[in-house]
């Protein structure tokens, strides 16, 4: 059973404020939730395999391959307007000033 003092402690930790008459209500509600959890804890799950995924698909793995290709030109092809060539030369994006 969750006591009023425990509910008050939880509300303080969660930075919530309840009126005094609501504390008793939450005490009984939290107690019923804990009772449901205790019922689940009593279930024997020794022969149940842990569920890691809801589907049995395997991830396709590929070998890691190191490449030394410079992708910056392809990246800076996305820059719009006249600043595209400058962005390719200096290898960074040029943006309008946003902080005064």
Curated annotation (Swiss-Prot):
It holds the Pfam family GatC. Allows the formation of correctly charged Asn-tRNA(Asn) or Gln-tRNA(Gln) through the transamidation of misacylated Asp-tRNA(Asn) or Glu-tRNA(Gln) in organisms which lack either or both of asparaginyl-tRNA or glutaminyl-tRNA synthetases. The reaction takes place in the presence of glutamine and ATP through an activated phospho-Asp-tRNA(Asn) or phospho-Glu-tRNA(Gln). GO terms for biological process: glutaminyl-tRNAGln biosynthesis via transamidation; regulation of translational fidelity; translation. Heterotrimer of A, B and C subunits. The keyword Nucleotide-binding applies. This is Aspartyl/glutamyl-tRNA(Asn/Gln) amidotransferase subunit C. It comes from the Bacteria. It catalyses: L-glutamyl-tRNA(Gln) + L-glutamine + ATP + H2O = L-glutaminyl-tRNA(Gln) + L-glutamate + ADP + phosphate + H(+); L-aspartyl-tRNA(Asn) + L-glutamine + ATP + H2O = L-asparaginyl-tRNA(Asn) + L-glutamate + ADP + phosphate + 2 H(+).
């Amino acid at each position: 059973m969750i006591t009023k003092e425990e509910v008050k402690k939880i509300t303080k930790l969660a930075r919530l404020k309840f009126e005094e008459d609501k504390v008793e209500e939450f005490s009984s509600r939290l107690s019923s939730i804990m009772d449901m959890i205790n019922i689940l804890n009593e279930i024997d799950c020794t022969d149940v395999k842990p569920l890691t995924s809801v589907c049995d698909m395997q991830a396709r793995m590929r070998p890691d391959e190191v490449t030394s290709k410079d992708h910056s030109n392809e990246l800076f092809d996305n820059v719009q307007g006249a600043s595209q060539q400058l962005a390719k030369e200096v290898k960074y994006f040029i943006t309008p000033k946003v902080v005064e």
